[in-house]
Amino acid sequence: MCWTMPSPFTGSSTRNMESGNQSTVTEFIFTGFPQLQDGSLLYFFPLLFIYTFIIIDNLLIFSAVRLDTHLHNPMYNFISIFSFLEIWYTTATIPKMLSNLISEKKAISMTGCILQMYFFHSLENSEGILLTTMAIDRYVAICNPLRYQMIMTPRLCAQLSAGSCLFGFLILLPEIVMISTLPFCGPNQIHQIFCDLVPVLSLACTDTSMILIEDVIHAVTIIITFLIIALSYVRIVTVILRIPSSEGRQKAFSTCAGHLMVFPIFFGSVSLMYLRFSDTYPPVLDTAIALMFTVLAPFFNPIIYSLRNKDMNNAIKKLFCLQKVLNKPGG
C-alpha cells in the first residue's frame, strides 16, 4: 500500500542523459542503518527480541483458535488469519533488517528488493482488507444479531478470508511487474531501512508515470477500506450506546474492543508512513516512522488480541496445559 507518490519524472530526466555511461544496478544499499562502529549491535538485540515476541505471540493466537472449539466462530477465525498474516508481514522485512545491522555492507539484491516490496505490501494490503471484513463481521453481530448466524456462515467466512488474501496479492502484482522491468542505472542508495516503493521508484532512470496511475488506484482502494471500517465502527458504537443495561453495553463492547484498538494503530502507522506534507523527512525521523510502521504496530497487535481477551487468554492457557501433558513421560 503506498499513499505518497513521487513525481513520475523525479530524478529520471537528469539520469536519462547519463545512463549511457553508467552500469546497470544489481543491488541496493540501505542508508537508514547505523554503522557497526556507531553501535548498530545495540539495535540488533531489541529488534531480535521484538521479532521473536511477534512470531511466538501470533503463533499462539493462531494455534489457540485452531485447537479450541470454543473459538470456532467468525470473529476468532478472522483474528487467527490476521495473526497468520502478521507473522509473514514482519518476516518480509525484519530478518533482513537484523542481517543488515550486523553486516558491514547493508545491501540487498535487485531481485531480493523487488520480492521484499511485493510480499511486504501484498501482506499489508491483505491485512487492510481483512480488517474491513472484521469490521463488517462485528457490524452484523451487533447491529443485526438475530440474523448473524444466517449471514456469517462458515462458507462465507472462508470465502472472505481467502478473498482478502488473494485480492491483497493480486492488486499489487501489475505494479511490481512494471517495477521489475524498470532500468536502474545509479545511484543505488535507498534512504530507508527496507525496500519501499517510493524510495526505489525515485532511483529509476526512466519515466514512471504508468506506475503512478497504479498508485492512485491503490490509494482509492485504501480510502474505501478506511471509510468502510470507520463507518462500521461509528454505527457499532452508536448501537452499543443505545443498549439500556450497562452489562449489555459492556458485553457488546468487549467483542469489538480489540478491533477498535487495532484499527487506529494499523491505519495510523500507514498514514504516518505515507501521508506526508513533505516528500522528505529528516533521516532520523524517517527511520523512526519506518520502525513504528514495520515493527511497533505488529508488536502491539497480538498483545491487544491476546491479553485483553478473556476467551483468548483461556485458550492460550489450555494450549500450555496441553503441551505440559504431552511432554510428560508416557504422555
Curated annotation (Swiss-Prot):
Originating gene: OR6K3
A GO BP entry: detection of chemical stimulus involved in sensory perception of smell
UniProt organism field: Homo sapiens (Human)
Keywords: Cell membrane, Disulfide bond, G-protein coupled receptor, Glycoprotein, Membrane, Olfaction, Receptor, Sensory transduction, Transducer, Transmembrane, Transmembrane helix
CDD domains xrefs: 7tmA_OR6N-like (cd15914)
SS bonds (residue pairs): 113-205
Keyword Transmembrane helix: yes
Keyword Transport: no
UniProt-listed InterPro entries: GPCR_Rhodpsn (IPR000276), GPCR_Rhodpsn_7TM (IPR017452), Olfact_rcpt (IPR000725), Olfactory_GPCR1 (IPR050939)
Cell compartments where the protein resides: Cell membrane
Recorded topology in the membrane: Multi-pass membrane protein
Regions of this protein lying in the Extracellular compartment: 1-41, 92-115, 177-212, 274-286
Pfam family, one: 7tm_4
Protein name per Swiss-Prot or TrEMBL: Olfactory receptor 6K3
PANTHER family named in the record: G-PROTEIN COUPLED RECEPTOR, OLFACTORY RECEPTOR
Transmembrane segments: 42-62, 71-91, 116-136, 156-176, 213-232, 253-273, 287-307
Residues with attached carbohydrate: 21
Biological role: Odorant receptor.
Family statement: Belongs to the G-protein coupled receptor 1 family.
Segments in the Cytoplasmic topological domain: 63-70, 137-155, 233-252, 308-331
GO MF annotations in UniProt: G protein-coupled receptor activity; odorant binding; olfactory receptor activity
Gene Ontology CC annotations of this record: membrane; plasma membrane
